[in-house]
Amino acid sequence: MPNTCVNYEKKCGGCPLLALPYREQLAKKQARLQELLGGFAPVKAVQGMAEPLHYRNKAIASFATQRGKLVCGLYAEGTHRVLPGADCLLQEEILNKTLAAVLDAARACRWTAYDEDRGTGLLRHTVLRSSCSGKVLVTLVTPDPDLPGSKNFCTALRKKAPWVVSIVQNINPTRSSAVLGSREKTLYGPGFVLDTLCGTQFAISSRSFYQVNRTQTEVLYKKALELAKLTGRETVIDAYCGIGTIGLCAAPLAKQVIGVERNPAAVKDAAANARRNKIANARFVCADATEWMAAAAGEGLHPDVVFLDPPRAGSTPECIAAVNKMKPRRVVYVSCDPETLARDVAAFTRLGWRASKFCPVDLFPQTRHVETVCLLVK
């Protein structure tokens, strides 16, 4: 694969495998999965992408002042030095175009970059989210609620990028590496962008957890639903449910779905997404997955299928013990880290479960990451 990224040699760190032919990338991922998981069950071939570039539907760029001019781009790996540019090979091309338009509009407003050492300036970051229809949500991250000229910015950006359907200001006053703060103001539009996965529509805001590769996420979710073998009669738990993506995709195939998520904003979004899709057989609980699962198991809840989609750190021994106590027919584990998946599958194995198969999907070409769906049965 030809390397045409201007920031690759400057080591932005976003695509460490870019110089490696895609076939070899998949082979490396397959070998790692086989080493970690092959002792439990067969590992299917990693399902790659036909076009493994420009797949990210989310972009995060930081602002800086360089040679007296406002610039934005990615950080050089391990630093807070901004590498200017809007031509990332991983981001959807509509996001690259939007990023260039955001910078032009910000310069026209004579806005300044936030200086983290002095604590001065207006702009910290911008976060962009795109939809399957090519619409974009733009979020500006500022240290202070006051953003003079915001109306002029919205007008200028909409003129340069008419596909932008909403502009949000996120306020992050903390001197930390966290990109987003907890407060937001909608400057234009609804404050979200609508996307579709597996026929289900989701509202995506700046802070929503949502898989960044739409094409491969559909592959991943369809495989998870296939392994669940839902017939319309099942009670399903979607643990670590986020904004409800897996659970709401499963709901038309199940009797009822219970989603569990500790982030209150995500639970609110999940409930709104259920209403948006007229899904009446799904409800969402704001609770820590481990604590809720343990309590529900103690109360005698016996779901037919449990979906586990934990963060990179994996699940917990207590959650796995609770799943075992619930005695579901199937557990479908969606993992973003093979090492923690291997650890958790070993924990299930000690409780008498058996991994039936591992189905890897490459959601992150040009990087070392890989997602895997695992079916566990007793």
Residue spans for each PLM region:
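Short, acidic/hydrophobic/Gly-rich beta-strand patch recurrent on exposed beta strands
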Residues: 73-76, 141, 270
